[in-house]
Amino acid sequence: MAFPIYLTYEEKEYDDGNQGSSGTEKGSKTKTDRINSGTALWRRAKSELKDDDYYEFYKQLSHDSDAPLHYIHTRAEGTMEYSTLFFIPKKAPSDLYNVDYKPGVKLYVKRVFITDDDKDLMPVWLRFVRGIIDSEDLPLNVSREILQQNKILLNIKNTSVKKLLSEFKQMADAASGTDEAKEKWETFIEQFNRPLKEGLYQDFGNRDAIQELVRFKSTAVEGWTSFADYVSRMKSDQKHIYYITGGGAVSGGEKTLRASPLLEAYRAKEIEVLIMDDEIDDLVIPTLHSYRKETPGADGKSESQTWELKAVNRSGADEELGEKKNKAAEKEAKPVIEKIKKALGDRVKEVKLSRRLHDSPSCIVADENDPSIQMAQMLKAMGQTSMPDVKPILEVNGDHPIVAGLKDIDDEERIADIAGVLLDQALLVEGIKLNDPAGFVKRLNRLLVK
């Protein structure tokens, strides 16, 4: 409330001095008590407030029965005068991924409520934030159209975003300290890692700061890891950050990616690969291209180092492993490659001899200029029916008995069945839904009979 509210009432008095006692009533007197604080909580000094004050206010503001995970209270004075009070929930709002989500930040002007339905008060990727913005400089009769173009509000928004990012970074840094701080940060990442990734795609101006916050799974460590942690573990001669995408809940997620044949060569060389198992990773990560980190130099000045991001499920990624082409092996495998190409026809973009496979007979990769099959399927599911079919590149292991055995087979139907199974199993192991599962079963049954 902007103004104090008082309640006036009559209080009876008794001759023994005790209210409500069995003594003789001797009269009454009028009393007046303040029933509110008189000052909006976000306008009060932080030194006057306790955690419980913030927690109770958050529950009233958000209708959340849980206390917030974190709160940030700021008072700015100078060229602009405003107060902000932001809360990070312990759990993601139920409408977080709805197009028609309800904004969580309310706008006040001079402690007078203006709106709680303006999605421009915060960037879309920070839609999980709850709280208050109270400006002293905006007019009270401000309209939605004016809000969208107002430089004062834009400055408050930009400053607030940087403040939130700074708080998130402090939470991340504190996670290496106490168990409580670690649990707090892990809760934050479990709930809001995906919106942060959206920020990488949507908020170019803050991309470097967001890159320090996003977390991924890894083939080298348990739990979450960051780009900074990855480069700290890199081999001295390693030039790239390797990652694999294409999981997602529909495709089997992290478990599917960890079992991918595409990782065999990296495991053999003990090279860490980041596991990016969220559907959004396929969209966001390729736009980053690289990770840049500032490090203190010998002269005290900061130095910048950049590492290129490389997807292991792209054609040509095996060349980065230092595996040299074996011309003799390619010459020997050429008749087999031609048989597979002829059998598969336009189901694939290309068939190649793989340098990355150790144990598996085949794998699929995407052309560098094509989206992944998983991304194409996701876009189609979202209604982009004009999305053309993406044809995979099939890589085969020339040393595997199934592939090598094709050299001595002349039966075209049998070659077609084996080639079809090599492709279908490569799709399945990546968690990709087959267009013709019945055809796969028929081919497999024919091979089992023979």
Predicted regions and their residues:
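Conserved GHKL (Bergerat-fold) ATPase module
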Residues: M1-K450
